[in-house]
Design a protein with these regions (language model features):
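Short, surface-exposed polybasic-aromatic patches that bind anionic ligands, especially phosphate groups
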Residues: 1-154
């Protein structure tokens, strides 16, 4: 997820052919310059007006017990189910995992099977200065759940 800080508030940052700017569902973070589109508010913003721009990614540690398969799994809010996390492997089919499509399989694990988690920030801009900085923080699973909730509700 791409995040931008504008006037001290965090927003999702959209940068594609259709639009460029910040979006939020939180009306309290908007002013008259935001355009309402369904339940979202959008404001075209130039990157020079943003104090921070960064990508945030969430990972959990789960050892699938298979040689050559990483134990760190990238997850998003969409991967969170009722007290389970859906892991996706897109480099082939793993034994005992559910086939989703060609060379893609999934497995659901219980929250209590997660021993460690981390959040990764890939900064493009910090405090108004262009920077290329990667920062990783190891956190508890509960802290990661709180972070995922916080960032998905920007």
């Amino acid at each position: 997820m791409l995040v931008a800080v504008y006037k001290g508030n965090k927003y999702k940052f959209v940068l594609n052919k259709r639009r460029k700017g910040i979006i939020t569902r939180c009306v309290q973070k908007t002013d008259g310059s935001f355009l309402k589109e369904n339940d979202m508010y959008h404001k075209p913003v130039d990157e020079k007006d943003l104090s921070d721009i960064y990508m945030i990614e969430f990972y959990i540690f789960f050892d699938a017990g298979l040689k050559g398969v990483s134990s760190w799994w990238k997850i998003t809010e969409a991967d969170l189910l009722d007290n389970k996390v859906k892991l996706r492997f897109a480099e082939g089919i793993l034994p005992g995992w559910n086939i989703e499509e060609k060379n893609v399989c999934t497995n659901e694990i219980d929250f209590n099977e997660i021993s460690c988690a981390k959040v990764k920030f890939v900064f493009e801009k910090i405090n108004g200065k262009e920077e290329n900085v990667i920062k990783e923080e190891t956190k508890s699973w509960n802290e990661i759940l709180q972070n995922i909730n916080e960032y998905s509700n920007l």
